Amino acid sequence: LAEFKAQIRLEITPDGLQIQIVDDQNRPMFDVGSALVKVYMRDILREIGSALNGVENKISLDGHTDASPYGSGERGYSNWELSSDRANASRRELVAAGMPDDKLARVTGMASSYLLEPQNPLSPVNRRISILVMTREAEERLLGRARTPLDATTQTAAAPAIAASGATKR
């Protein structure tokens, strides 16, 4: 990964190692409105996929868009679908590099809800992929293995609100 160090931002978070792929020339990973991975980013994703083979931890993969509204808006294909498609396209590149598909715990579309450059919401760098190498604790929380029951106060306070909303058990 040394050859790509200018394009990869690493951050330790409470949930694990966050990998943000950002081109050193500020090129986007994706064209506007497209889920096709740019050729120059495919190499980075495949190198990361190969490197993640040596890690036991599960991976969470998030796709992001800039804040520009996508074509058909609320009722049709939106930034939510586009970011999900980008995440899935990136997943395919990681798997093509030999990363086992079952290493992925989650593939999510975030739309423009978490901008890398919030001061410039239309910036191409906001169109990106985030990879989280999850801690064991984060994996357990996500997969529901470390569930803790709500305390009685929370359950009691939530019950009337849920009942008033008309929610029913399924």
Question: Which residues fall in each region the model found?
Answer:
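Periplasmic OmpA-like peptidoglycan-binding domain that tethers envelope proteins to the cell wall
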Residues: 22, 29-40, 44, 55, ...
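Catalytic cores of peptidoglycan-degrading enzymes
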Residues: 51-54, 58
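Beta-strand-connecting loop/turn residues
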Residues: 15-17, 57, 112
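Extracytoplasmic juxtamembrane/flexible linker immediately downstream
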Residues: 1-20, 25, 141-152
